[in-house]
Amino acid sequence: MGGKQSTAARSRGPFPGVSTDDSAVPPPGGAPHFGHYRTGGGAMGLRSRSVSSVAGMGMDPSTAGGVPFSLYTPASRGTGDSERAPGGGGSTSDSTYAHGNGYQETGGGHHRDGMLYLGSRASLADALPLHIAPRWFSSHSGFKCPICSKSVASDEMEMHFIMCLSKPRLSYNDDVLTKDAGECVICLEELLQGDTIARLPCLCIYHKSCIDSWFEVNRSCPEHPAD
C-alpha cells in the first residue's frame, strides 16, 4: 500500500478491466501480451489468467497469428495458470496454437480445451456442403414432381402438389388379350395372348397387376404423365 508503481505496471492494455503488472511486460523479442485479468473474489483467492487469447480484437492480425475471431473459455493449465493461444507467449512446441494451425484455413473451426477459432474464410456459405442445396431449390430451374414427373416452377410448387395429390386416379377397363401385344413398359415383360390387361383411357395397355402396383404411388399413365 502506498508503494509507487513502476511505469510498466501503470501501463494499460487495450481492454477495459484488464489490470497489468510487471509480469505483463513482454520479454525482449517475445510475443505481444495484454496482461492479466482477475476472475476470483477475495484478496487471497484472486487468480489471474492470460487474455492474449483475444488476439485479433484490437491487434494487428499479422501479430495475432492471423486469427480474425476467437471464442475462448479459460481453463487451468498447471502451475501459474498460463495459457497458450494464438498471439500469446506459449511454448513453440504446441503447434496447435501456432500461427496457421489454430484454425482451418478452408473456413472450418478448430476446437480444443474450450477454445474455438474460426478461419479467415469461415462463413455459412463455406460451411454448408453443396449437396444441401439441390438444383431444384432454384427459382429458375424448378423441380421435378415425384408424383407426375412434371417439371414445376418453385413458386407454383404448393399449388401443384395440392392439385396433383387431389387428382383422381385413372380408371381402366379389364380385358383379356386375344393376341400378343408387345412389351409392358412397367415390368418389361411381354404381353402375351391370354394375359389379363388393363386398358387406360389413353388406350395404353399393361398387365393388370402391374398397373395396380403403379397406381399405388402414381396417378397418371406411365407413358403419358402430363395427362
From Swiss-Prot:
Against PANTHER family, the record matches this protein to: E3 UBIQUITIN-PROTEIN LIGASE ZNRF1 (PTHR46661:SF2), E3 UBIQUITIN-PROTEIN LIGASE ZNRF1-LIKE PROTEIN (PTHR46661)
GO MF entry, a single one: ubiquitin protein ligase activity
User: Per the record, which residues fall in region Disordered?
Assistant: 1-42, 65-105
Describe, as the record does, how this protein assembles with itself and its partners: Interacts with AKT1, GLUL and TUBB2A. Interacts with ZNRF2. Interacts (via its RING domain) with UBE2N. Interacts (when phosphorylated) with YWHAE.
* Cellular localization per UniProt: Endosome; Lysosome; Membrane; Cytoplasmic vesicle, Secretory vesicle, Synaptic vesicle membrane
Zinc-finger ranges (RING-type):
184-225
Per the entry, what this protein does is: E3 ubiquitin-protein ligase that plays a role in different processes including cell differentiation, receptor recycling or regulation of inflammation. Mediates the ubiquitination of AKT1 and GLUL, thereby playing a role in neuron cells differentiation. Plays a role in the establishment and maintenance of neuronal transmission and plasticity. Regulates Schwann cells differentiation by mediating ubiquitination of GLUL.
Taken from the record, one Pfam family name reads zf-RING_2
Membrane disposition = Peripheral membrane protein
Encoded by which gene? Znrf1
Q: What is this protein called?
A: E3 ubiquitin-protein ligase ZNRF1
Residues covered by region (Required for endosomal and lysosomal localization and myristoylation): 2-10
Pathway membership, UniProt: Protein modification; protein ubiquitination
Keyword Phosphoprotein assigned to the entry: answer is: yes
List Phosphotyrosine occurrences by residue: Y103
What Gene Ontology terms describe where this protein resides (cellular component)?
cytosol; endosome; lysosome; membrane; synaptic vesicle membrane
Q: How is it modified after translation?
A: N-myristoylation targets ZNRF1 to intracellular membranes. Phosphorylated by SRC at Tyr-103; leading to 'Lys-63'-linked ubiquitination of TLR3, lysosomal trafficking and degradation.
* Catalytic activity reported: S-ubiquitinyl-[E2 ubiquitin-conjugating enzyme]-L-cysteine + [acceptor protein]-L-lysine = [E2 ubiquitin-conjugating enzyme]-L-cysteine + N(6)-ubiquitinyl-[acceptor protein]-L-lysine
Sites of Phosphoserine modification? S50, S52, S53, S123
